[in-house]
Structures are given as C-alpha cells and as structure tokens.
Amino acid sequence: MQERYDFKAIEAKWQKKWEELKLYEVDDFSEKPKYYCLEMFPYPSGKLHMGHVRNYSIGDVVARYKRMRGYAVLHPMGWDAFGLPAENAAIKHGNVHPADWTWDNIANMRRQLKELGISYDWRREIATCHPEYYRWTQWLFLQFYKKGLAYKKKAPVNWCPGCQTVLANEQVIDGECERCHSRVEKKELEQWFFKITAYAERLLQDIKKLTGWPEKVKIMQENWIGRSEGAEITFKIKGHEETISVFTTRPDTIFGVTYMVLAPEHPLVEKISRGTQYEKDVLEFKRKMMYLSEIERTAETAEKEGVFTGAYAINPFTGEEIPILLANYVLVEYGTGAVMGVPAHDQRDFLFAKKYNLPIKVVITPPGQELKAEELTEAYTGEGILVNSGEFTGLANKEAIRIITQEAEKRGFGKYRVNYRLRDWLISRQRYWGAPIPVLYCEKCGIVPVPEDQLPVVLPYNVEFRPTGESPLKYVPEFLNATCPECGGPATRETDTMDTFICSSWYYYRYTSPRDKQQPWSKEKVERWLPVDQYIGGVEHAILHLLYSRFFTKVLYDLGLVHVDEPFTNLLTQGMVLKDGAKMSKSKGNVVSPEEIVEKYGADTARLFILFAAPPERDLEWSDQGVEGSFRFLNRVWRLIYQTKDRISDELREFSAKDKELNRLLHATIKKVTEDIEERFNFNTAISAIMELVNGLYQYKEGEINPGLLKEALNKLVILLAPFAPHIAEELWEALGNKQSVHLEKWPEYDEEALITEEVEIVIQVNGKVKDRVMVPRNAAEDELKEIALNTPKIKELTADKKIIKVIIVPEKLINIVVAG
C-alpha cells in the first residue's frame, strides 16, 4: 500500500477488475431474494451532468447495499435514445446523422458511467433507437391497436412552430414548448392517439396502492387525471335538428342558465352560425383562437372574450331560449366543449355576463338571506337553498344536485356522468428520429397494421431532416411505398414516428430479457424481477413518464403479458443540483463538469460529495469547498489505514474501558448507517456517522490498542464506506489483507448489547432547577446516587447550611434535591 492516495490508479485498477470478475452481473434465477433497483435512463446528450451523477450515485448506494444484504440485485442501464435533440444537432451541424450522433454520445456517456464506478450489469444495456428494441415498441403498438386503444382522428393539436411538430398536452408548459420554449399554436391534423382515458379511473383509484411514492407525486397525478362528478344535460338548438350536450358539476343551477358558450373548435360552430349576420365575426373569432395557447385562453387573469353565434339553445327544464356564444375560456378537449353559463353562481360566467350584458338570474341563496341579481358584485358560489327553480325550489342545493340529475335522466335529456381532465395521449410526431408507427394505408383496405412478422419497420438512413411540418419520411420513396399485406395492392407507410415517451413506458421490462429475439420479454424473467423495487428519478417526470408507465403496465396486465398492474413499488424523486442558487445550465454559465471533478479529485470524491451535501429529495447547492472536504476525508481514511494496518491481528484481548468505548462507537455507527440507508435514504447522515467513526479510530490508535478489535473496526469501517466510495474501499480492503472483493462481503450486523454504555449522564437539580450534570454507573443503587449527588463540589456548596427535605430520584435521568431556606 502506498502512502499517498493515488485515486487515478486505484479507480482504473478496480474498474478493470470488476469487469474481469463480472462482479455486477446478476443471475436471473439465483436462489437469493430479488431486488430490482432502477434509475431513470438518460437521453444520450453526449455528456453526463451533475444531475445524472446524483441520480446514479443514489441508485448505486442502494444497489451495492442490497447486494451486501444478500439480495440478487438487478441494476441495469440503457439509453432513451430517440428524440428531437439528435435531429436538431443534425440540422445545426449539417454533416452529422442523428444515428451517428446518438451512438457516439452513448459511447461517451457509457465510458463516463464506468469511470464513476456505478455497479451496472452492462450485459443488459439497451438503446431505444436500436431496431431490436423498437421492433418491440412497434409490436406493443399493434397490441394496443388490436385492443382498440390506438386510434387515428382529426383533432386540434398543440403545434410547436420551433420544433415543427405536434406536442402532447403534457409537453406544453405555460403555453410554451417544454423543449424550445416557442409559443404553442393550435392546428387541426390527423393524428394517432392512445386511449389512456379508458384507464383514467383505474389510474386514479390505484394511486392508493402506491404507498412507497412521495405524496406530492401522487397529488400531481390525481390533479392531472382530474376526476369530477356531475351531469351531462342535452339542450336542443332552436331551428336545428342537432343538440348540444354540456357537462356540469352543478346541475342544481340549471334554472339559472342564461346563456351557453361553445369552444371555438366545437364541431357545430360553423353550422349554427351559417347564414346569420354574425357568421363573419364567428369565423374571425375562431381563426384568432387558433393562435392562442390553452394557458393564454384559460388563465384566471386572461380577459374573457366571446362572440354571439346568432343561434339559441333551449333550456330543457324551463323551455327558455338562451343565446349561444363562443368564448375563449372554453376548450373543446375538456368535457363536451360546451358550457352552460350561470353568472349568478360561477365567477367566470359572472365576469363574462357583465362584459357582454347577459342576464343574471339568482337560483341559490344562503339560508335565511335574499340575493338580488342587480345587487351582486360577484357570483355567489356557496351552499344554500334553491329559489326560482320550479318544483325544486326550497331544496338544499347539495340534495338538488342528485334530484335534478335523476329528473333529467327520467325525462330523457340528461344523465349522471364522471368527467376527467385527462385527455387521450397524442403519440404522432412529424419528425424522423423516432420509432416508425407500424401502419400502412391502402386505398382498398384502409388502415392496415403491419404484420408482426414484418417488424421492425426500420428507419431509413438516407433522409433529409430539415423540418417542414411534415415527416421527413414522406420524402423517402423506398420507405414510403409498400405492398398491402391484405390485398397485395400498393400501399403507403405511415410517416409519422412515435412519441419517445412510448419507448420509455416499457423499457424496465426489456432489461429482464434484453437480447430476446422471440418476444419483448420472457414472462418467466418478468415474474422473477418485476415490479421494480426502487425507482429513482427527477420529480419533473411525475406526470408524463410515470403516468404513461402506469398506463402501459395496466394495459399489459389486461393483455396477460405481465403479472403486475403497477410497475414501481417505491419511488424516490431526487432534488436538483444548483450552483449559486440556480439550476446548472449553459445559459447561466454555472455548469460544473463531472469529468473535471473526476479528473481532479476522483470518482469516489464526486460521489461522496454529492451524497453528503444534502438528503436525496432536497435540492443540493454545489460547493467547491464541499468537494475539497470530501477529498480530504477520503485521504484521512487512507492515512488511518496506512498508519494502522501493521498493528492489527486476530488477537482479541479482554476489553479495556477504551476498547469498550470504541466497540460501542463501532456498533452505533453500523446501526446508524444501516437505518439511514434502509429506512430513510439519509445518505448524508450515514456518511456523517462514518466520519465520526474515523475520528474515534484516530483517537483510539494513539497509545495501547487491542489488535483484534482494531482489525474488526477497520474492516467494518471499509465495508460501511463501500457503497458510497467503492474504489477506495476495494483498495483499503485489499490492504487490510482480505482476498475477495469488499462488495461481495456481508453487511455487518450491530450488537444491541454493545450499544449499552456502562455510565449514563444524569441531571442534578436543586428545587427543580438544573445545577449540575454528572456521569454515574448505569445500574447504581439509589443510596449510591444520592451520595454521588450530594458530594459533587457544586451541590455541596449550594446545599451547605440548608436543610435537605427530600431527594427525588428518576433512574438514569435526574436527581432533584429539595431544600428549605
């Protein structure tokens, strides 16, 4: 063992050895209990950033710890490799192909991950852009299609003019594209969708099964699904055969409806306004709305805008004619795209009615009060009693919701309905670098799924990527033109590619059988490994990726392809890595490169700092001093073992008081580190406990030592350090004379007996006020305690010349001396 901690040589040596020993390759059918530890796989951008290092270091501690606890640990890594950045790089640089760019990036990031010493089973590596992977993505699309869960329809979609493609609702943040921040527009296009709404209720109800998930993630999913109960009521349109259905959570206010508003995209808009004097205004309003995002149209602060269509609806309960308007705040994707206006009892309706001089009619009043429409300064939205409501007048409004819904059902113009905010998942993308949708179009046969034995539908290599708003694949004749498998006639291929979130919705199954050419996964292996025991990733995936993965798993369960209906038992969402209080980004100029840190201090220091600086779920503030501190600590551990390794042996002498204190500290540390990893993932406090043990060992080695105890303490120290700093732990383990890898060692158990100290500190009070503290034998008799307390110098002085009335003793806690005078 060298005197100097040469991290470069040590880390290279052990990474090579681990690979030679196949140390982290797991046997699918080991007799050990299974543990599936998974970090969200990255997009291969080319370089790891500190967020990656944090994510993978957290996962690696868990994986290494569980191996040492006797589990067969599946800990794989792969690449979420399709997506716009590869295409954008090709466009930007002009001479690089997305495939080449992606594979080069994968090679670089794989090297970086190996240099960090993350304990992956690299045999299982997958990349979603490999035909052997997306073949099964396409196969899964066909299973969804057969089950009626994949369909094509013309729909107003979110169009990003910057990326020149369609976005799912979840990819629009505050009216902007989450990737390039362009303002998102609305466009009518034929698109493919997955019918996630068919699973809305199950996705919502099963949130309660997710006991190992953070509360905030569960709440975000609940809100996104957005369940509401109410009634669907059908209104006739004066002079037209068509009807308009509205969904309302407040059927108790039906008698207060004074107008109706439609979304500008509602299919009846043009028909009901045709030939009226308002037609031109209606078409202009509709055109204007196409350029506004949902946020711009529906925000609380947004100006409520509308236009009269010239048509009237008929209230089915009262027979009253009410004007039909278009309004910016009504969206065709939500409910039915039509809303009944009740200005007296809905604030948004109230503001709209005031602006356009529409009537206001009070139909609910607080008990014992009267409300006058002309005196209202805002809508009354509280509980109350129905007024001006025909035969329902006098009912409490909560009761009226049920009764009016039943009455509407009885009369044939309404029904109870559950509505969801969740929309179907739009999966078409007009870009090249994605999995082709395995569908053909035949003039004779219509939509024809590609036969399974013709998969994969491979992406052609020679393609022009410049975005035109249409898929680049449209301009590749050898891809586009095909033969219909049903009639043998000419057919064309679907040229849109799939949303990359489809690829990442099932990847955790493929890790169980990454090279299987016959099926997406072996059922036997999935039954062995799934569900994922611990999933780790950023909270920014709370809705998109996690909801889609839950949806996929439920569909696969229904198809009999998997045995679980929830994919992830436990979820840890780690915080961001900040510098100067802001998220690291090139634009802010505050990026710290992991490669530079590894070069200067080593991977173990980088890992240790990032695990020590904050609990995993909190944001972490980068600190150069903190990195220096972690490096100094590892050097301190190195010196400790360098200075003591020749003083240890198997000779275990009888314990002195000093030995007992070290033994107690050792077992207290084992207990603390074990509980912090096992129960709380508080790696920062676990590392802190290891640091205290190192301090204790430095004190212990001065003077007389017990060679057997010191050997045990040093060995256990190295084992405790191993999940956090795996390379230095291996080197120190070898220096201590051990033969097999430290990562194959059994995790140490702590002895409760050893934790018991022989002395305890007790408080001494005089008349209830703390005056002194003293160490006493743990099981001292009351007479002995009384004598110790009365003879301490401080208490002697305070009780001199005073009459002691009584001495109250609370064992192992306090002694209270009650005196007079």
UniProtKB/Swiss-Prot annotation:
A motif ('HIGH' region) lies at residues 42-52. Its EC number is 6.1.1.4. InterPro entries: aa-tRNA-synth_I_CS (IPR001412), Leu-tRNA-ligase (IPR002302), Leu_tRNA-synth_edit (IPR025709), M/V/L/I-tRNA-synth_anticd-bd (IPR013155), Methionyl/Leucyl_tRNA_Synth (IPR015413), Rossmann-like_a/b/a_fold (IPR014729), tRNAsynth_Ia_anticodon-bd (IPR009080), Val/Leu/Ile-tRNA-synth_edit (IPR009008). It is an enzyme of class 6 (ligase). GO terms for biological process: leucyl-tRNA aminoacylation. It catalyses: tRNA(Leu) + L-leucine + ATP = L-leucyl-tRNA(Leu) + AMP + diphosphate. Keywords: Aminoacyl-tRNA synthetase, ATP-binding, Cytoplasm, Ligase, Nucleotide-binding, Protein biosynthesis. Gene3D superfamilies: 3.10.20.590, HUPs, Isoleucyl-tRNA Synthetase, Domain 1. A motif ('KMSKS' region) lies at residues 583-587. Pfam families: Anticodon_1 (PF08264), tRNA-synt_1_2 (PF13603), tRNA-synt_1g (PF09334). It is found in: Cytoplasm. GO terms for molecular function: aminoacyl-tRNA deacylase activity; ATP binding; leucine-tRNA ligase activity. GO terms for cellular component: cytosol. ATP binds at residue 586. Belongs to the class-I aminoacyl-tRNA synthetase family. PANTHER family: LEUCINE--TRNA LIGASE, MITOCHONDRIAL, LEUCYL-TRNA SYNTHETASE. This is Leucine--tRNA ligase. It comes from Carboxydothermus hydrogenoformans (strain ATCC BAA-161 / DSM 6008 / Z-2901).
